[in-house]
Amino acid sequence: MTEGPHNVLMVTREMSGDRRYGLGRSLMPIVDALVGNGWRVRYLCQEDLAAASKDRRNRWLARLRQLPGVASRPPVQQVLGALAERVQMGWLAAHTARDEGYTAVHLHDPWLGLGFWIGRKRLGLQNLRWGITEHGFGCYSRATHEDGLVQGPRLQRWLRRLEAFVLQRADWVTAPTQLALDQLARDLALPFNPPHWHAISHAAPVMALMQREAACQSLGWSPQNFHVLGVGRLVPLKRFDILVAACASLALRYPSLHLHLLGDGDRAGLQQLADAAGFGDHIHFAMVDDVQPYYAAADAYVSTSVTESFGLANFEALIAGLPCVCTAVGGVPEVMGNGAWLIPVNQGALEAALDALIDQPTQRQTLAARAAAQAAQAPNLEWVVEQYVRLFQH
C-alpha cells in the first residue's frame, strides 16, 4: 500500500441487510481487504440515519406533495422522495466525516454525492477528498428510470444537469466498466470522458467449488436432470419472463430441464407463467446466503437482463467456469468477452442457445473452457483495492 491517510467512509442508501444481496455483495470484500491492511473503514447506510431525521424528511415531503404541479403527479412525488432520501444520507455523511475524522469519502450514487457536496460546503470541509461510483449503465437518472422510478423528458433533463454538476465537483468518479463510463458521458452530453473518471472492475471472487454431483446432493437436485441457473432481483428489467418462457418451451423436448432462480422479489408472476405453460413443477426459487453450491451444481447459467453496468452474477458464473448465455447489453460484452454466448434480448435467440447447450455436451465443454480462459484475465482483489487506495490518497 502507498503512504498516506488510512481511513475512508463508504456511503450507500441501502440497509445493512443489503450488504449480502445488494451493493454490499461487491463492496464488502473491498472493505474487508482495506481493514485487513490497517485502514479504518466505516460503512454508512440507512440504518445510521436517526428516526427523528427520517420523520423530519417525511413531514417535509408531505408538505411538498401538496404543492401545485406536484400534488397531481405521483411520479414526480416518487422522484422527490428518492432524491430527498439520498441527499439526506449524503448530508449525514458530511457530518460523520467531520465528527469522526475521515479524510476520504466514497459515495455510491450521485444523489448521495449532491447531499455530501452541500454538507461539505456548509461545514467547510474543502480539504476532504470525495468521489462517486456510478453503478448503473450510463447516468443515474437513466438507471433509476429503467428500474421503475419513472421520469418524464423534462425531469430527466433537469436530473442529468444536476448529475453533471455533482460529478464535475467530485475528486473521482468510477464505474465498473469502460462502456459504462462512455455511456455516462453520452448521457450527460459531455464531449469526452473527464480525466478524473476511472473504470475499476469488480474483483474476481475466490471460489472453492464442490464437484457437481456433491453439489447436487447438497441441494437435493437430481444430477440426471439439466439445471439452468438465473441469479438476480426478480424485477422487470431482468426479463426472467423470457427465461421462464424459453425453458418451458424447451422442456417439451427436454423433460429433465429445471430452472432455478436465485433472488429477492415478487415470484408470483413468474410462477403463474410457468404454471400456464405446464412448467410449474420445474421452476424453483430461492434466497440463499451462499450461491457457490448453485454454481457448482448448475449445467448452464443464463442472464436475460435488459441493462447491466457490469453484471456481478454473470461474472461469478464466469469465474465458476459455467457455460454462460447472456444478453449483450450494457457492460456485459466487456466483462464476459469470449467467455459467454452473447445474445439479444429475445426468446428465440435464447431458446436456440440453450437448445444447443442441452443437446450437445461438446458445446457446453467449449463454452466452459472459454469461460475459464476469460476468468483467468479478471483482476484480483488486491489489484482492485490498490486502484481505490490511489484515489482515496491522491
State each model region's role:
Residues G22, T362-F392:
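A charged, aromatic-enriched C-terminal amphipathic alpha-helix characteristic of glycosyltransferases
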Residues M287-D289, Y294-A298:
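Short alpha-helical donor nucleotide-sugar binding micro-motif in glycosyltransferases
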Residues V306:
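Aromatic "clamp/platform" in nucleotide-sugar-dependent glycosyltransferases that forms part
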Residues A340-G348, A356-T362:
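Conserved acidic donor-binding segment of nucleotide-sugar-dependent glycosyltransferases
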